[in-house]
């Protein structure tokens, strides 16, 4: 590995002085292997140029380009350490992540019947999946040379994840890939979304590229007006640009980290998992076994996986005022997914005042901020948007098993425009497992759009316990603004839950214990119903302490899940609650200021300022 201390020593020698502030010059530090920041860098501040032009990158230039006619340019693939052309699944052209040749060019197709699964001992993964293709897709696949199909990849959306598999064979309208055995809850089915990438016969649109691995070259169709091509691929196998290990009190300022590889494989990627975000094995920058490692005013862009991971036994530190965009997966991961009782976990990490946008470009199930097994962390005042899956996720244990994920704070974040109607079962803020002392507050969440189901705003999933969710504003979600799968003793208080498409509130498992307390909330809708249909009766049967909530249907009709509000309130004992117009200034235009005469105030609702959510005002 390249050691950061060598770069630091060179910078200090050039400055002719002894100091703990290492000023890195403008320009690129181009890596071919991971840079290690160890204990010999403790106490140092690595400060890039004030304009952010100091960049640590794994970029490898592609070119020169040859005009092949027909709107196609070609360039040789760079050679790897073994002297052979590298294989790449990512290409950046003129600062833009270019689109791989794709079938279809936009959108998706679906199998015509449920996918057939058979045991296949000869395959590396043990199972073979066979898809029946729609005729228009089969025609394109049949047109591709058989020798190239091995370099084409099927992307198959399975609820909350995306499987990625090279094509094994094609015949008579059926395409086969090798993968892991399907879980009972994530079968590949007729209506699921699919596409095929890196298929020569789909290389037909401006801005697309095709990796001809057999010929050792890249083909590209320029966009209109794109005369000069400045193109890069990530260095082969370089998933992590910088690894910090056993260091303390290290700060990185004004540095850009760019262009890491999505996976270490030398050929077409095979990826499948049974849980969202579980695939993620790396990040552009990883911190392990270190204390107070801080990233301030840094930029993470064009990554292959997550941007930043505070991984194992990290104490303190975090990301402050950073920007992360064009991400292969998500923004920041904190902690590990595995944990044994008694083990130290990552703690005290902050993600504060950051912009995390446009993620999931290679791994669509990437999360904006993912807290696994970690405690006492804070995710505050961030803007998180443009993802295909969840905004902030907290916890990694199912049911009521003991968990080290405690006392985390998710507050004052603006989380919006996620899901993009491609994955399912997501939340603006998602929690999983016991999480005593965790607080989710003062967030603004909107634009959560799922494919088949589960575009939730606030989502307490399996075994969530001991969590307080208060002072949040949620609107424009596909499913409930608040949904609890099952959990115990959570508190949902003083939230504004507005106009979800299919229902406003859901509790989908009734248990013997108290599931939650729901008090002083304002719930208003113009479409759907008060409760999501498949959770409606369970929401009534679950042990919930309902108190002093305000419910309002925009047309004023006192219809409440097929009955009257008075009847419903009497059955569930929603004590002190009312059906009344909350008197917002203009809720349809997202002005949620309350009139002084609002009946919500008489119920004890405490107004909060949604404009405080998101990055702090500059």
Residue map of PLM features:
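Bacterial N-terminal signal peptides that target proteins for export
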Residues: 1-6
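Bacterial Sec-dependent signal peptides at the C-terminal "C-region" and cleavage site
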Residues: 7-19
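Extracellular polysaccharide-degrading/modifying enzymes targeting complex plant/algal/animal polysaccharides
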Residues: 21-301, 340-341, 573-580, 588-618
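Predominantly extracellular beta-rich ligand-binding scaffolds that present long acidic/polar faces
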Residues: 32-40, 45, 466-589
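Short glycine/acidic-rich loop motifs that flank beta-strands on beta-rich extracellular proteins
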Residues: 33-34, 239, 261-267, 282, ...
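Extracellular, surface-exposed repeat architectures
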Residues: 46-47, 52, 56, 364, ...
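Right-handed parallel beta-helix
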Residues: 248-259, 291-302, 314-329, 343-360, ...
């Amino acid at each position: 590995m390249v050691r950061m201390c060598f770069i630091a020593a060179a910078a200090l020698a050039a400055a002719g002085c002894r100091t703990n502030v290492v000023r890195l010059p403008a320009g690129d530090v181009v890596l071919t292997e991971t840079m290690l920041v160890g204990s010999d860098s403790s106490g140092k501040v690595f400060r890039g140029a004030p304009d952010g032009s100091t960049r640590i990158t794994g970029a490898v230039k592609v070119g020169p380009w040859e005009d092949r006619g027909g709107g196609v340019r070609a360039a040789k693939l760079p050679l790897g350490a073994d002297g052979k052309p590298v294989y790449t699944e990512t290409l950046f052209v003129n600062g833009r992540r270019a689109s791989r040749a794709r079938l279809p060019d936009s959108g998706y197709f679906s199998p015509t019947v449920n996918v057939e699964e058979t045991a296949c001992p000869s395959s590396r993964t043990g199972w073979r999946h066979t898809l029946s293709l729609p005729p228009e897709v089969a025609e394109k696949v049949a047109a591709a040379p058989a020798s190239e199909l091995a370099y084409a990849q099927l992307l198959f959306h399975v609820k909350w994840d995306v499987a990625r598999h090279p094509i094994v064979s094609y015949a008579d309208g059926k395409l086969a890939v090798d993968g892991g055995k399907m879980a009972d809850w994530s079968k590949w089915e007729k209506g699921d979304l699919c596409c095929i990438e890196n298929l020569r016969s789909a290389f037909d649109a401006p801005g697309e590229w095709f990796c001809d691995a057999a010929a050792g070259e890249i083909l590209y169709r320029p966009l209109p007006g794109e005369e000069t091509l400045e193109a890069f691929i990530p260095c082969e196998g370089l998933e992590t640009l910088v690894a910090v290990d056993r260091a303390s009190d290290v700060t990185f300022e004004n540095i850009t980290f760019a262009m890491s590889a999505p996976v270490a494989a030398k050929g077409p990627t095979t990826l499948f998992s049974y849980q969202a975000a579980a695939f993620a094995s790396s990040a552009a920058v990883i911190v392990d076994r270190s204390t107070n490692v801080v990233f301030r005013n840094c930029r993470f862009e064009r990554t292959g996986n997550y941007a930043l991971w505070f991984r194992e036994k990290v104490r303190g530190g975090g990301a402050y005022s950073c920007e992360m965009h064009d991400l292969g997966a998500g923004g920041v991961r904190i902690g590990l997914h595995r944990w044994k009782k008694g083990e130290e976990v990552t703690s005290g990490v902050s993600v504060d005042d950051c912009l995390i946008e446009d993620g999931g470009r290679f791994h669509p199930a990437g999360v904006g901020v993912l807290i696994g097994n970690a405690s006492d962390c804070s995710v505050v005042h961030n803007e998180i948007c443009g993802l295909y899956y969840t905004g902030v996720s907290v916890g990694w244990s199912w049911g009521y098993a003991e968990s080290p994920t405690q006392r985390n704070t998710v507050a004052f974040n603006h989380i919006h425009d996620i899901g993009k109607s491609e994955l399912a079962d997501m939340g603006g803020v998602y929690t999983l497992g016991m999480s005593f002392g965790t607080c989710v507050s003062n967030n603004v969440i909107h634009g959560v759009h799922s494919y088949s189901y589960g575009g939730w705003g606030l989502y307490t999933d399996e075994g969530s316990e001991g969590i307080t969710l208060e002072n949040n504003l949620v609107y424009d979600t596909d499913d409930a603004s608040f949904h609890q799968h099952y959990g115990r003793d959570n508190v949902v208080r003083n939230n504004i839950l507005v106009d979800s498409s299919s229902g406003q509130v859901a509790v989908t498992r009734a248990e013997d214990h108290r599931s939650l307390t729901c008090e002083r909330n304002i719930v208003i809708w113009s479409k759907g119903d008060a409760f999501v249909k498949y959770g409606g009766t369970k929401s009534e049967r679950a042990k919930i302490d309902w108190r002093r909530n305000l419910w309002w249907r925009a047309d004023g009709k006192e219809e409440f899940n097929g009955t009257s509000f008075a009847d419903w309130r009497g059955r569930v004992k929603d004590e002190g609650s009312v059906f009344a117009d909350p008197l917002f200034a203009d809720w349809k235009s997202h002005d949620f200021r309350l009139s002084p005469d609002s009946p919500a105030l008489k119920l004890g609702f405490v107004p909060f300022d949604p404009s405080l959510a998101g990055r702090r005002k500059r």
